[in-house]
């Protein structure tokens, strides 16, 4: 019996049950601890979607990883302005996931939604390419850049993001079934979905890794050529995606589920005093028994379970605020460090993707199966806690690293004065302002963030998919992805201070915030992995 079916039959009798049981069902789906339960093969249809996402991520990272240096050197923006624009782009890329979920659920279904937003995305990449031509710099440079980012690429990627990972996971058979060649062994749906999300996340990073390796090198020749490559790769991805249409299972649209959800929550809150005593306030939506409401008891019960699960997402905006430093502030730091002539400041993020690509198969094929055989359960909540802890340690390291960069000659903290208060001359070109500290000292930061992603980000995607009933999956996935938008808002606020000599304090504040959030998250949710 699935968690959704169990949820339909569950009767809550006290406040304690109402707090624990909905989440208990989510964790039951997320953790399987038996030697007789194994993951099944990933269907070919799911692989086509995963390959499409690889191409999309090549395009996204291949273009976006250039933005900071492009704005600083070509569009001549300050570090603070460039960071604010970058975080604004990230905000729109993730807040638009909600719109993408509505379009898929109400009108088009996931396949058509992904395809249409992919075309808009490609048009944005074309405009970005044209606006970066040197001869158009003064007229179209900044306006074309902003329009392509905020009106086209961000909407395109947002519409895709809210649907593509869920679409891949929905290609998995919905029920457990016996292994065809191993008697007594069961192909488990939950573990198979977990595998899909890990390989989906690995594809994201293979695409990102290739984009980060290729486009920065090409940008040395011409910006427009560097931006053209992501556009071409994404066209290839769209073709691959379209060719798989006959093989896809595409859940038909069932109306505006997000709108129905909001109306149900509002009605439940207004009628919370009419619910059965001892039940959650959402059960107020069941107060009318005359069939006049647009939802039934099952929808309300599913919504309650989803509501409890979504509490887990509350800390993610802080995590994403730290994570997004890779796209801007880490590049700001790298620009001012010594590095080989062949290495561009943003290319070190290649290491982040490489770590994920290497570690995910190791965890999937070796580590997690051994843990299951040993009877050790590493549930989703504990995996997320591990990810949060690692990124906290990463930013402690980055804070110390920035401190040493400011202590290094010849330009120290880039304010025009040395530690003795004597005036020093700062070159006009930001790329000429380099202190005696190697860019390779950034390697631990990229490695740590990569490992944290496997535990926090990939698990978050998986948890979001499992925490919702079928009709709410796109809504919940979009809400999880929207946490990145709120992380970008935090980054936009921090961008006010994201100029030299303030970066030590900016990094330290983020490390402290993430440490506090990790402690609170563990205190509030760690028990959920142990309640079954």
Please name every model-derived segment.
Residues 2-9, 14-178, 188-532:
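Hydrophobic transmembrane alpha-helices of multi-pass solute transporters/permeases
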Residues 180-183:
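Membrane-interface alpha-helices at helix entry/exit sites of multi-pass transporters
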